[in-house]
């Protein structure tokens, strides 16, 4: 029960971080030598409009994870779904960094929180399997 509480708190912190306007870095080039970096929230449609749909997927899956964790307080069979959603969140974050060079400190913190919750879920699922 403590691990679920920690997991829910970590996911809520991740959602708060994703709502800040410094989550996704996007670089725009006004000329061959000029580059401007602007920052957007994970929930902003600006990165989605420029083809970077990984942040919005990460944000939506994080909300799904929170809902699954809340449902999992009463039912114990949501662990695998939470693990899959978290793995997809981490993969989407890394792909966004690699393909679009959209890495920021907030993005790294969000991915770290996802990783912490994934480790907690895997350890909890292995304890339940015994």
Region locations from a protein language model:
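A cytosolic-side transmembrane-helix exit/cap motif
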Residues: 27-32, 103-109, 125-130
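Hydrophobic transmembrane helix segments
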Residues: 6-60
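Hydrophobic alpha-helical transmembrane segments of integral membrane proteins
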Residues: 78-116
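N-terminal membrane topogenic signal
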Residues: 1-9, 122-126
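Membrane-embedded alpha-helices of multi-pass membrane proteins, especially ion channels
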Residues: 17-21, 69-72, 93-96
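Membrane-water interface at the C-terminal end of transmembrane alpha helices
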Residues: 72, 112-130
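Alpha-helical transmembrane segments
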Residues: 16-19, 64-67, 116
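Loop-to-transmembrane helix junctions at the membrane interface
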Residues: 51-92
């Amino acid at each position: 029960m403590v691990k679920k509480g920690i997991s829910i708190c970590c996911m809520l912190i991740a959602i708060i971080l994703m709502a800040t306007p410094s989550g996704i870095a996007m670089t725009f080039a006004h000329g061959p030598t000029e580059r401007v970096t602007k920052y957007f929230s994970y929930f902003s449609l600006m990165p989605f409009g420029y083809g970077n749909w990984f942040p919005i997927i990460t944000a939506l899956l994080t909300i799904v994870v929170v809902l699954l964790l809340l449902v999992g307080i009463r039912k114990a069979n949501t662990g695998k779904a939470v693990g899959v959603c978290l793995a997809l969140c981490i993969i989407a974050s890394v792909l966004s960094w690699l393909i679009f060079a959209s890495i920021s400190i907030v993005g790294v913190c969000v991915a770290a929180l996802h990783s912490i919750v994934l480790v907690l879920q895997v350890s909890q699922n292995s304890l339940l399997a015994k």
